[in-house]
A protein has these predicted regions:
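Acidic/histidine-rich catalytic cores of soluble enzymes
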Residues: 195-306
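Active-site oxyanion-binding pockets that recognize sulfate/phosphate
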Residues: 150-157, 195-199
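Alpha/beta catalytic barrel-like cores
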Residues: 1-152, 159, 168-169, 176, ...
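Extended substrate/RNA-proximal surfaces in nucleic-acid metabolism proteins
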Residues: 168, 174, 180, 203-210
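Aromatic- and glycine-enriched pocket-lining scaffold segments that form the walls
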Residues: 175, 181-195
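Residue-level signal for short, function-critical loop segments
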Residues: 99, 190, 231
């Protein structure tokens, strides 16, 4: 796409939106400030660097066997760098605890330290990325029976408590060195395949474990904790300890950020509808944007109705400073760098559309009970020239606009990933 064509289309878009009282330049400036947290685990199918032959557990599954997945830290970072080069703006990288730079040593989860992630911090500093972090309470012998922080065995619980505390120390150090608050997310797979009698016991154990974890105080200037629920997983269809109600209650009672994952609810339930309620009670919200197809399948994010509804809720609530956007999917059936770029660009497009929404007029219609007018304008807004604005945003950031990035990824595959 020629630069002159992009600029010409952008000028038309500016004029068209101006007719509706919308400042396109301001919307672009706002989008420029929005960082999306890119999940490192798409690049290697959630394998990590503890044990390359280890099995992915925790009721999650990466399906597909597309060639070229990252096998080492250097390959994974190179793939992320490539994806970032095709995504406009400055963004974050989200790391799980079993992606440490262990130097060939066996380091158990309760023994991880900031030194095992110093090379990640150095890389992020060099590339101008910021980092987020996650405890990894799955794919480990001490999570094999499906329970971690809620385990009946106090010794098992203590192991995972120590792991999460160590993870929080790492997140704090990441935030300190990079000058940006690192969000540390806690998700545990705890649950049962079939009918569970002592449901209260496990939830009491989880609450007490979290209480012990948060007794270790961290600096809020460097890191923030977030807690994540789930409805069910493979092997935990009947009961999940960390339900939405559990974490919503714990988060509100203890002033903790709450993570909402698009795929962690019933297929007919959407997290966009939860944003406005949680904003009234929780200090902040972390989003793990995914695309579940019939279950929590973690398909690549696309520009669908729910993604648009999700970003609209954030912008309409004027909550950009309280809602953090991260991605969480892992499709092993397609080019993994392509999966990154498609998902992040889709999320950015949805955010841009929301920023360009004629919200003042829509609110006026709603307040006056003009429901036909509201519906009509919502529909017309869908076909406004937002895509021309996104192309301009790409151009402004020195990133390929339009579908031309496909060929760039194909070339990288030919030269790099196909040789693995």
């Amino acid at each position: 796409m020629k630069e002159s064509q992009i600029n010409q289309a952008f000028e038309y878009a500016k004029a068209r939106y101006a007719d509706l009282g919308i400042d396109v330049e301001k919307a672009v400036e706002q989008l420029e400030k929005l960082s999306i947290s890119l999940h490192c685990w798409q690049a290697d199918d959630v394998t990590g660097f503890e044990n390359g032959d280890g099995e992915l557990t925790g009721g999650i599954q990466a399906t597909g066997n597309y060639p070229g997945k990252a096998r080492t830290i250097s390959e994974l970072r190179a793939d992320i760098d490539k994806a970032m080069s095709l995504i406009p703006g400055d963004h974050r990288v989200n790391i799980h605890a079993f992606y440490g730079d262990f130097g060939g040593e066996t380091v158990d989860r309760d023994q991880i330290e900031p030194k095992h992630f110093q090379s990640w911090i150095d890389w992020a500093k060099e590339k101008n990325y910021k980092l987020d972090f996650n405890s990894t309470c799955f794919s480990h012998e001490k999570s094999a029976d499906g329970f971690t922080l809620s385990h009946r065995d106090p010794a098992i619980r203590k192991f995972w408590i120590n792991h999460v505390i160590q993870s929080r120390k790492i997140a704090e150090e990441m935030g300190r060195q990079l000058g940006s608050k690192c969000i540390h997310n806690i998700w545990v797979p705890d649950g049962s395949k079939d009918l569970t009698v002592d449901r209260l016991l496990y939830r009491k154990n989880l609450k007490e474990s979290l209480d012990q974890i948060f007794e270790y105080k961290t600096n809020d200037d460097y890191m923030l904790d977030s807690i994540e629920c789930k409805l069910f997983g493979i092997g935990s269809e009947s009961y999940v300890v960390g339900s939405h109600e559990f974490y919503m209650g714990y988060g509100v009672a203890n002033n903790k950020m709450i993570t909402l994952d698009s795929g962690h609810f019933h297929p007919t339930e959407v997290i966009s509808d939860k944003i406005s309620s949680l904003l009234l009670f929780a200090p902040e919200i972390m989003l793990h944007v995914s695309r579940g197809v019939r279950w929590d399948s973690d398909h690549v994010v696309i520009l669908n109705d729910e993604l648009q509804a999700l970003t609209q809720e954030i912008i309409r609530a004027n909550a950009l400073d309280r809602v953090h956007v991260g991605l969480d999917y892992f499709d092993a059936s397609i080019n993994r760098i392509g999966a990154y770029v498609v998902g992040v660009r889709a999320t950015q497009k949805a955010l841009l559309q929301a920023l360009l929404e004629p919200i003042a007029q829509l609110r006026a219609y709603e307040a006056n009970g003009q429901n036909f007018e509201r519906l009509a304008l919502l529909e017309e807004a869908k076909s406004l020239p937002w895509a021309a604005v996104f192309d301009y945003y790409c151009l402004k950031n020195g990133v390929i606009a339009g579908e031309a990035y496909i060929a760039d990824i194909q070339q990288y595959e030919k030269e790099v990933t196909s040789n693995r």
